[in-house]
């Protein structure tokens, strides 16, 4: 029989930089998970994606064992990296902070495809363009 799930924890952690300090420690400590075991495994799995924030879904079982799934980085993080900016615009309708080429948007959409519920790359591109628009980033051809 399959192990009984007692908790699902969703976190966004910088790649290769998980440590027992907040937010990781308290979230996993409540579930009774071996925090250092998770940190070592997460850091090993995400070492090649340094500098990006990686969403992770941790499933905790009754016997306090766990499994986790890493997702693709949020579109906003990938857009900020592509545009070379620290943060988006506070007033995206008035202040535009950067421009990104459409081929870069396609690249981001292809990266995000496994996590998006889009039927095609074009639909995924529209989702990424929407995220860019709400951050004050202009898309140009």
From Swiss-Prot:
Signal peptide: none annotated. One of its GO terms (cellular component) is cytosolic large ribosomal subunit. Keywords: Methylation, Ribonucleoprotein, Ribosomal protein, RNA-binding, rRNA-binding. InterPro entries: Ribosomal_uL11, Ribosomal_uL11_bac-typ, Ribosomal_uL11_C, Ribosomal_uL11_C_sf, Ribosomal_uL11_N, Ribosomal_uL11_N_sf. GO terms for molecular function: large ribosomal subunit rRNA binding; structural constituent of ribosome. One or more lysine residues are methylated. The keyword DNA-binding does not apply. PANTHER family: 60S RIBOSOMAL PROTEIN L12, LARGE RIBOSOMAL SUBUNIT PROTEIN UL11M. Forms part of the ribosomal stalk which helps the ribosome interact with GTP-bound translation factors. Part of the ribosomal stalk of the 50S ribosomal subunit. Interacts with L10 and the large rRNA to form the base of the stalk. L10 forms an elongated spine to which L12 dimers bind in a sequential fashion forming a multimeric L10(L12)X complex. This is Large ribosomal subunit protein uL11A. It comes from Bacillus cereus (strain ATCC 14579 / DSM 31 / CCUG 7414 / JCM 2152 / NBRC 15305 / NCIMB 9373 / NCTC 2599 / NRRL B-3711).
């Amino acid at each position: 029989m399959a192990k009984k799930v007692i908790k699902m924890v969703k976190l966004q952690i910088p790649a290769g930089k998980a440590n027992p300090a907040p937010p990781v420690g308290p979230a996993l400590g409540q579930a009774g998970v071996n925090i250092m075991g998770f940190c070592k495994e997460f850091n090993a799995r995400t070492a090649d994606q340094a500098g990006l924030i990686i969403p992770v879904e941790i499933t905790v079982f009754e016997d306090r064992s766990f499994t986790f799934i890493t997702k693709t980085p949020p579109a906003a993080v990938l857009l900020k990296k592509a545009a070379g900016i620290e943060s988006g615009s506070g007033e995206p309708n008035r202040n535009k902070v950067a421009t990104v080429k459409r081929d870069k948007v396609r690249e981001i959409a292809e990266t995000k495809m496994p996590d998006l519920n889009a039927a095609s790359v074009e639909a995924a591109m529209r989702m990424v363009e929407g995220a860019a628009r709400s951050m004050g980033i202009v898309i140009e051809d």
